[in-house]
Each structure stands twice: as C-alpha cells, then as structure tokens.
C-alpha cells in the first residue's frame, strides 16, 4: 500500500497514520461508513489538506429500518421468546422483559441528521412520542420535540428508548457517559448505531 500512495489522489476506506506521510498527492478520502469508527480521525489526518467524505444520506432508510427492527423486537420481548424456542420451551406467559405498547411509548433520538430523521418518522408511524437532540438541526422533522445537548440526561431519564444515531467523532466522544446511563429508567432500552 505504501508504494502506491505517492501517486494516489483518492482513497476509498482509511489511511493509517503510518501510511499518511506517503500520501503526498492525496486529495480525497472516502469513508465507507456514514459515521466513521473510533480511530478513523487522528491528528495528522485532521491537519492534512485531504477532503474527507462519507456516504451521508445513502443509508438513511436502511439504517432507520434496522433500528426499528430492534425497537419492535425489544418492545415485544422477542429475545426471550427466541431463547425459550432455542431450548424447546413453550412459554405461555409473557417474557420476563417488559412489554412496550409503542403507541404509548417514547423515544429520544440523539443525532437527528438523515438517519435520525428517518428513524423519527418511523417511530412516529407507530404512534411513539419522539424527542430529538442535535447540534445543527439541518432537517425539518414534523412531530419531533426538539431539545439541546444540555438536556440529554433529563430527557433520557423520561423515555422508553434512547437511540443514538450521532456519528462517532472527537466531538461526540463521551456524550453517553455514566451520568446518562444512570439517569435512564431501569426498563429503558438504549440502541447505538
């Protein structure tokens, strides 16, 4: 890889810190993820003149559907039923987890960009009350109750589902800390994408 980098203008993926010094012509770095993972950004990359892009918007509906799959599965106790099925047990009673009527449930979406907006619309389609926290508020999302980042702990304490669709960046590191998780209700569900 290092031998190819001096003549490379664009990379799809990631350039490690030890390879970046060889990327003399690098002008474009395309991340394959909407929100790059921890370690993607490092000091030398941030200081480099390369333009870093991501496929923002491409996966909005797919990821929102994936999130709703978890919301539905967890609200109905599906993991407990699957565990009983795996052990060939017929459980007539409700599972040990709390049943959540989504039409009476609430969710907090942290990061209301494209994925968060799509998730909000799907939650609302099930009758859920949806709260959102975002720093930029780029999207109009009808029916969403807006909050600022300083309200994270308080709103997280009130909802049934806390859904994080915020990208993992240096600015969001530590956003979900012990205080937030301690404030959440014991029966609340946290999902991080």
What are the functions of these language-model segments?
Residues 48-106:
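Phosphate-binding beta-alpha-beta segment of Rossmann-like dinucleotide-binding domains, i.e.
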Residues 116-117:
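N-terminal Rossmann-fold NAD(P) dinucleotide-binding loop
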Residues 131:
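Conserved beta-strand positions in the Rossmann-like core of class I SAM-dependent methyltransferases
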Residues 4-5, 20-23, 102, 153-157, ...:
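A short, aliphatic-rich alpha-helical micro-motif
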Residues 1-52:
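An N-terminal-biased, well-structured beta-alpha scaffold segment characteristic
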Residues 136-193:
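Rossmann-like adenosine-cofactor binding region
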Residues 112-113:
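Glycine-rich Rossmann-fold phosphate-binding loop(s) that bind the pyrophosphate
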């Amino acid at each position: 890889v290092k031998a190819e980098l001096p003549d490379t203008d664009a990379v799809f993926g990631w350039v490690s810190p030890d390879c970046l010094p060889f990327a003399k012509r690098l002008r474009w770095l395309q991340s394959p993820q909407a929100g790059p993972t921890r370690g993607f950004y490092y000091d030398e990359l941030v200081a480099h003149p390369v333009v870093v892009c991501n496929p923002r918007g491409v996966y909005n509906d797919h990821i929102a559907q994936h999130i709703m799959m978890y919301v539905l599965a967890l609200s109905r106790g599906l993991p407990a039923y699957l565990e009983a099925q795996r052990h060939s047990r017929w459980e007539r009673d409700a599972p040990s987890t709390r049943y959540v009527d989504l039409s009476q449930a609430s969710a907090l979406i942290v990061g209301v960009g494209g994925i968060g907006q799509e998730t909000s619309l799907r939650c609302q389609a099930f009758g859920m009350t949806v709260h959102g926290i975002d720093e930029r508020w780029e999207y109009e999302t009808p029916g969403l109750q807006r909050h600022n980042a300083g309200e994270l702990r308080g709103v997280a304490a009130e909802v049934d589902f806390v859904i994080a669709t915020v990208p993992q960046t240096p600015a969001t590191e530590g956003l979900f800390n012990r205080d937030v998780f301690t404030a959440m209700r014991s029966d609340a569900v946290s999902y991080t994408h």
